[in-house]
């Protein structure tokens, strides 16, 4: 690590790519200590036998299957030797407990799962005698299966479904999962038609090849769109702008026309009830028309103010396309991030399951053994939950810092032939050596906002239908405010990472510097975040629409099943996810380029010794703006371009 003994300069000057020093080392140490705590939770759950109980399974008497057990004092049938009984078998696998998320059935350790359906207790007896696998409670011998009066309650529910062991988890699971499907039907209120879910699942299974092909199509379309945006960004932005203006004007005009038409045709001779309804409708149309007019006027004023700044959005999108040409590995960044998140989530769920089987044995209300954590250690669940949010945000922040570092390297390298062989890997190297503490701090700030919001959402869901209107309104307002704060902090964090990548300053310094730059360029930020984000959103909709249309055409000719709604929904959701991943990277690149451009125009003016770093396309934008400054009536843009002189700021 390059972090040892590094110091932070008190005086801060923007010095792209010249110096790198370690940032926020205390936060890195805190994050490492937190991860050690996460490891302790995992080690504790394994040391207390939770891992073996989860993987190998245990019966209702606390015995772990597949091994010799020690006696648990005070519990009957504990301490049995199950070396030859490697599988957990549930007497009634369909008896599900939704609240506690488990099967409410007696569990036994057996040597073999029933490979065929067993219709009667005589079949169960014959299976035990033939295969040596006793499917009834340990207190019964196979000879008692058909004679003992306790057999109906201590033997599996008939008919015993055909089962197969779950790989790696040693549980006997019914091959036909109809009981789970029916339970899901009740859960999602499909009780009115018990065959709906079966037909939906059948549609997914029959169309799996088509689903995979359409998912691949969405991937290809996303990559094609990223190339297209570079070359037609100018046309696309103006088309979107014109459509928005025409749509708002047209909608406002239609509302006023409807109001005038309804007012003209209002019949005062109608019955009182109908007359009141007509007057209410007329009043509503008037309110809608006035609101639409105000919205349209504000929108047109914003378009008028920002019309020349739209050119900057177009130029940035053009340069972003060039960035992807020079840094092709950027395209694969979402995959690496998703892979890292997936690995962590799998680990987190596994430890969560370990914790679910950790602790000391106790007797539940049915008289069987369960394991619970008592004392202060029971709060490990909360620690584990905070770890889920913080580490997930840390991984996402690492992606943002990696992209920012690579794009900053591209922007501030005058000769693109001097770029590192792999700027992405160079950025990852800088991240690991210098800036992990900054990333950890930024992720923690998001976590601090996200956890209270999640708690309030949980309280709101638990009190649904019980709280009064005032409390409900306050809860929703708090949740909304925290959500807005989270989004604002996430945007500021992203720009802080860019400032750190440029200047190697700590998180707070970088966030303050980035905020100053953003405030000085507020109108430009508004133009990029409205026009640019809206264009990318339409790109996502375009990919989903094309994929969905292709899916409809393909599925319409598939006659092997009757319902293809669920396959189409799956395809469209995957298409939106893929498009979001790709175009979000595009959006990040544009945001990083904008901050670099704002810094470039603030501290350089093109004179000797203060040459611009920017791309030719952005240079043309600056030159066009300078020419506009010299024209009569260009005072607004003149104020915007004054910061190009050294020491001034951008409007």
UniProtKB/Swiss-Prot annotation:
Glycans are attached at residues 131, 176. The keyword Nucleus does not apply. The chain crosses the membrane at residues 26-46, 209-229, 235-255, 285-305, 312-332, 335-355, 377-397, 439-459, 534-554, 563-583. GO terms for biological process: choline transport; ethanolamine transport; transmembrane transport. It is found in: Cell membrane; Mitochondrion outer membrane. Signal peptide: none annotated. Keywords: Antiport, Cell membrane, Glycoprotein, Lipoprotein, Membrane, Mitochondrion, Mitochondrion outer membrane, Myristate, Phosphoprotein, Transmembrane, Transmembrane helix, Transport. One of its GO terms (cellular component) is plasma membrane. InterPro entries: Choline_transptr-like. Choline/H+ antiporter. Also acts as a high-affinity ethanolamine/H+ antiporter, regulating the supply of extracellular ethanolamine (Etn) for the CDP-Etn pathway, redistribute intracellular Etn and balance the CDP-Cho and CDP-Etn arms of the Kennedy pathway. Involved in membrane synthesis and myelin production. Belongs to the CTL (choline transporter-like) family. This is Choline transporter-like protein 1. It comes from Xenopus laevis.
